[in-house]
Amino acid sequence: TKRIQSILKNRIFDAVMDFLCYSDKDTADSFKFYSQYTKQYFFISSCAVYNTSLGGIFKEDSPKVLPVWDYSINKWASEKKLVELATGTDVKYTIIRPCVTYGDTRIPYGIVPQYGYHWTLIARVLNGKPIVRWNEGNNRCNMMRVEDFAVGVVGLIGNPMAYNEAFNICGDET
């Protein structure tokens, strides 16, 4: 940490993007460190913070937290911690809640191991094999390519309307 601080000394970045925090402690540590070096701190949360048991289309002010999923609980706790820490400082924060994102190197799907095996899903699709689906195939999931996510993020950097706000960034694929 000392070495990084010496390298970053006297540098201020337009934005820091935090993709790595999965708990309120992670968020507190990250914000305390990086907020010294940025004008706008981005926390990449997840649409998973919403209470999906309620159904429907979720907006930024929709009810939060499906209380049975640690990922949802922890991302929401992280958001609350960020707001608490940023309040009263000069650092502007922006919370981004993406839907499921995929790209050429990662295609998340619940039955596929997280890293290195996502092409097994694609192989099943290409070979006409069955794919396991939850809730008798009635579950819906919004997905978007990482490039589309990036377009949404770029529009928020340095944008005063994005300061101290949360945004859903979702694709048009369901």
Model-derived segments and spans:
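NAD(P)-cofactor binding segment of oxidoreductase domains
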Residues: 10-57, 66-69, 73-84
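Short, flexible/disordered intra-domain loops and linkers
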Residues: 107-114
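Short amphipathic alpha-helix with an adjacent loop that forms part of the alpha/beta core around
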Residues: 3-11
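Active-site Tyr-X1-5-Lys
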Residues: 66-97, 104, 117, 126
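Hydrophobic/aromatic beta-strand patches that form the interior of the parallel beta-sheet core
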Residues: 17, 42, 94-96, 167
